[in-house]
Amino acid sequence: MKKIFLDANIILDIFNPSREYYNYSLKFYNFALLSKYKLFTSCDLITTIYYIDSKKDTKQALLNIQDINKTLKVIEFSNKEIEETCQLMILEPQYKDLEDTIQYIMAKKYECDLIISNDKNFISKDIELITSKEFCKRYIK
């Protein structure tokens, strides 16, 4: 396992101790960095993270984004991936959430081995999907 895609909720967790999965997400994140995994997220999640974090503290939200920018590869998507996302959602009705489906398409494009998300509704047909808690129990001794 070398490439891991992070959903927005994982990134939000690592910067906010009051979130339910903070400890697991932070433990996963630190382990992944030390283990030299390649971590990915998509560009649209950066604005989502800023929007949520800036409600509490704008400067800290920007510092968090700078940290993400240094430790994760932020990947872009374009018309092609949007079309793939729409087609997948039309053909396979279990894909209901546009943002999550774009993340799945981007994880596939970058050949990620794993998607980490604490969203119980996230769908991933052919990339392993686990929570930060499951990752910690499975891979961190």
What are the roles of these predicted feature ranges?
Residues 26, 44-46, 50-74, 80-81:
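Active-site-proximal, substrate-binding regions of enzyme catalytic domains
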Residues 9, 44, 101-105:
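Active-site phosphate/pyrophosphate-handling residues
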Residues 3, 109-141:
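Acidic, PIN/NYN-like endoribonuclease modules and their adjacent C-terminal/linker elements
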Residues 34-36, 70-71, 125:
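Structured helix-beta-strand junction loops
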Residues 1-40, 54-63, 135-141:
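Short, well-structured N-terminal submotif of metal-dependent ribonuclease cores
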Residues 73-120:
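Active-site neighborhoods of divalent-metal-dependent phosphate/nucleic-acid chemistry enzymes
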Residues 40, 75, 130:
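General small-molecule cofactor/ligand-binding pocket signal
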Residues 31-32, 68, 88:
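Hydrophobic helix-cap positions at the C-terminus of alpha-helices
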